[in-house]
């Protein structure tokens, strides 16, 4: 199997939540506008130290959701229209926002766990808001209080769904979320 196919199979297996943990939210995302609306609704709930773990196959909408969150957070003039590219090749993109800098991280291309130390993720986890694509690459290093956002396709590969799962105060924070 190709490395890409192996990763897809691995991430697909990790998308299943434990049987004893129901998602806090399970919503349809019928179109890109719904994904953007979810990002705009999630942004005001974020604070320093939050880690949003974005799970999903290639093309599931992880970067689109991260882009919507980043653009929705208060920042310098023009932040709402700022270009927010996928960090697939740069691995990390940072954005000055309120209440904290946002680290948009894509770990898809990480082959060796030793590469993770060079990214400065401990700083991001402590002092910023981290939007993390392909978080399975972190293994045990993913903070326990991260919010897991699982983006999936239906059997036909057309309609999307999102499931949000998190401990700590995430149930309270997400209680009023209405995308």
Show where each model-derived region lies.
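Short phosphate-coordinating micro-motif centered on Lys-Gly-acidic
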Residues: 15-20, 25, 111-117, 121-179
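N-terminal pre-Walker A segment at the start of P-loop NTPase domains
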Residues: 18-39
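Hydrophobic anchor at the beta1->P-loop junction of P-loop NTPases
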Residues: 52-54
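Conserved lysine of the Walker
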Residues: 62
């Amino acid at each position: 199997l190709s490395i890409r196919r192996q990763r897809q199979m691995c991430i697909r297996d990790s998308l299943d939540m434990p049987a004893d943990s129901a998602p806090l939210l399970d919503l349809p995302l019928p179109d890109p506008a719904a994904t953007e609306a979810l990002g705009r609704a999630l942004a005001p709930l974020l604070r320093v130290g939050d880690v949003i773990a974005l799970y999903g196959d290639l093309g599931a909408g992880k970067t689109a959701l991260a882009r919507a969150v980043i653009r929705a957070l208060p920042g310098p003039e023009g932040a709402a229209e700022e270009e927010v590219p996928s960090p697939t090749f740069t691995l990390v993109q940072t954005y000055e926002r309120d209440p904290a800098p946002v680290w948009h991280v894509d770990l898809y291309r990480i082959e060796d766990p030793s590469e993770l130390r060079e990214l400065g993720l401990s700083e991001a986890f402590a002092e910023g808001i981290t939007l993390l694509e392909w978080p399975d690459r972190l293994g045990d290093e993913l903070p326990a209080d991260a919010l897991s956002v699982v983006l999936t396709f239906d059997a036909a590969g057309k309609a999307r769904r999102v499931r949000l799962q998190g401990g700590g105060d995430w149930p309270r924070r997400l209680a009023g979320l209405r995308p």
